[in-house]
């Protein structure tokens, strides 16, 4: 499959057309961003680590019966995916309080959330990815009711699969975001799953092993990503 013209350049990935209208190539770059793209740095090995991490997770989800856009890994930093008509909302599942939830509600970081919470955010960096709900999503034509129900159902299924996977590596999956799109009238998981889009803590020490290390200038960002990968069985070589 040959990479053709650039279709879209995001904060950390570039999307390319292919000769097949149903397929795209994602290139994972070393770019790392925070503050809705206002802070961007290059971190060596990040593109390779995230591509391999994502391929591993997507295969685990597919094995559990969750349809994703992942087709196959093409190289160290490229992957072939289905072309989805993306729904412009992020689905956020939280098992423990962290990040914006702590700031909004004055919760203690690490407070257990039982059952896990589920939130929707409109994907727009200029607006700061504001929280929205199903009613707004339907009224503005982003998705219909059946699609939103399916997205919520799949988000909780992903959580069940991945909390068990991370727990086996003595890790806590604190929270994560997912993006979905439509492929031939089906809701399909898109984008990526990597430490860029979730929070992962060491179970014993609560050490942060995700993108918060970059956001909070804690250092050793990629080393933390690689540690998580090693502990859940991601092949990095």
From Swiss-Prot:
PANTHER family: MULTIFUNCTIONAL PROTEIN ADE2, SI:DKEY-6E2.2. It is an enzyme of class 6 (ligase). The keyword Ligase applies. This is Phosphoribosylaminoimidazole-succinocarboxamide synthase. InterPro entries: SAICAR_synt/ADE2_N, SAICAR_synt_PurC, SAICAR_synth, SAICAR_synthetase, SAICAR_synthetase_CS. The keyword ATP-binding applies. Transmembrane segments: none annotated. It catalyses: 5-amino-1-(5-phospho-D-ribosyl)imidazole-4-carboxylate + L-aspartate + ATP = (2S)-2-[5-amino-1-(5-phospho-beta-D-ribosyl)imidazole-4-carboxamido]succinate + ADP + phosphate + 2 H(+). One of its GO terms (cellular component) is cytosol. The gene is purC. Pfam families: SAICAR_synt. PROSITE patterns: SAICAR_SYNTHETASE_1 (PS01057), SAICAR_SYNTHETASE_2 (PS01058). One of its GO terms (biological process) is 'de novo' IMP biosynthetic process. GO terms for molecular function: ATP binding; phosphoribosylaminoimidazolesuccinocarboxamide synthase activity. Belongs to the SAICAR synthetase family. Keywords: ATP-binding, Ligase, Nucleotide-binding, Purine biosynthesis.
């Amino acid at each position: 499959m040959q990479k053709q013209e650039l279709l879209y350049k995001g904060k950390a990935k570039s999307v390319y057309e292919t000769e097949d209208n149903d397929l795209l190539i994602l290139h994972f770059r070393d770019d790392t961003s925070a503050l809705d793209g206002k802070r961007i740095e290059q971190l060596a090995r990040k593109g390779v680590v995230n591509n391999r991490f994502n391929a591993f997770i997507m295969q685990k989800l597919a094995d559990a019966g969750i349809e994703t856009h992942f087709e196959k890994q093409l190289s160290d930093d490229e992957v072939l995916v289905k072309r989805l008509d993306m729904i412009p909302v992020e689905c956020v599942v939280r098992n423990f309080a962290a990040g914006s939830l702590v700031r909004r509600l004055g919760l203690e970081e690490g407070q257990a959330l039982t059952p896990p919470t589920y939130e929707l955010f409109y994907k727009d960096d200029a607006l700061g990815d504001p929280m929205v709900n199903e009613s707004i999503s339907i009224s503005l034509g982003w998705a219909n009711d059946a699609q939103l129900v399916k997205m919520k159902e799949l988000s909780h299924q992903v959580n069940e699969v991945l909390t068990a996977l991370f727990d086996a590596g003595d890790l806590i999956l604190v929270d994560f975001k997912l993006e979905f799109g439509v492929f031939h009238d089906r809701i399909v998981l898109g984008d990526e799953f990597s430490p860029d889009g979730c929070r992962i803590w060491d179970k014993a020490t609560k050490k942060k092993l995700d993108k918060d290390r970059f956001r909070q200038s804690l250092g050793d960002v990629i080393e933390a990503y690689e540690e998580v990968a090693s502990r859940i069985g991601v092949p990095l070589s």
